[in-house]
Amino acid sequence: MKNKLIIGSWSGIPEYNLLKKNDDEFLEEQFKMLAESGVELSPVPICHASEEFRLKTLELARKNGLKQLVEDYEMSVFLKTLKNRPSVTEEKAVGLIREYSRKYLEYESFAGYFIADEPSIEEAENLVYASAIFKKALPGKLFYFNLFPQYALPSCLKTDSYDDYIAAFAKAETDYMSFDFYALMTENGENYVREGFLENIAKVKKVCENRGKDMWTFCCSSAHYYGAIRGSETYGQAAFQAFVNYTLGARGIFWFCYYAPDVDDSYLNALVSREGRKDVAYENVKKVNAELKALDEYLGNYECVCRGAVINGLLKTISDGGLTDKPLADDFTVKILAAEQNVVFAVYKQGDKEGILITNFDEPTSGRENTVTVKVDASEAQVLSAGKTEKFRCANGELKYKLKSGGAIFVSPCGR
């Protein structure tokens, strides 16, 4: 049984804007807007927040049907240094964590603690140790940390091996592994997909499968580094990131950023501006979130049995932590036969029912057509696209379908 799909984000609603404290009316409106965006796990603000504000966000999250992460400096430091405190026994640590957390546990919206972002491998042992004690103290609550992508420099990872890096953190007593990879780039006026995107997902997914964890990934909604990394200025860019990650097995989709972070002027076009107004990415991400939820609900008890890609006309299977030339199983009744541009796909089964999820992996601003040919062995095929289903006639048991920018479809046979 699949765990619930989680849609979250980064950079939450702040306590202050440009040194001015946000009033209650402003915060009420902001949390309502957050809930309407389809984000369900409310993020912590980038800047440090007071305990009063943390408790207020928990109440506002509760009122709007959200779960709320908490970043508490005292708890973070305690957990990160716990392994270096032999005088604090495991039993004592469990008691201290429970006692300190009582003020947060009063709120049903309390999801857990934000602990660290992009730690180096040197921090792995401490986080792994603390996660085990935390799980005993607060079972069911998040001990949340997020990992570097494989394009991070060795000086950041503190190792030359990304495989070693993720393996070290996979030992943590968490039900998930979270990492970020921002794929949509611009250089000298040319838009492109950053190399290694699929490979990074495949590596982390393999580790997650071996450890029985869910994979959580990030999509970029806020352009940064002065536009070098693109966000979700178009629906296609938002959909491309979310559906590629989902197709390749993500059970958590997080958007970076929700609220434009008040750190420097290179962060552009988040879901919400620093003034608290809906920005260019808001409606795009809101639409994609709704489509993700509809797709995940539609798939229900389907189980994924194979993932792959068509890259430059060549069929690739995603297995063993990478893209391989291993052929697909011959017993699939639904197969992708051809794609004009790159796609990723996943084959699903439920009893004797079968279907295939196909996502457009062509650069989402290219404007190129991407018609896919799917073998369905039926006179008709049912296609789920953008949250709606439609039946299509098939010629000789094959369906041809034109994917839109960033688009995803789930195809299943009918009318046999």
Residue ranges and their predicted role:
Residues M1-A378, S385-R416:
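Glycan-processing catalytic domains of CAZymes
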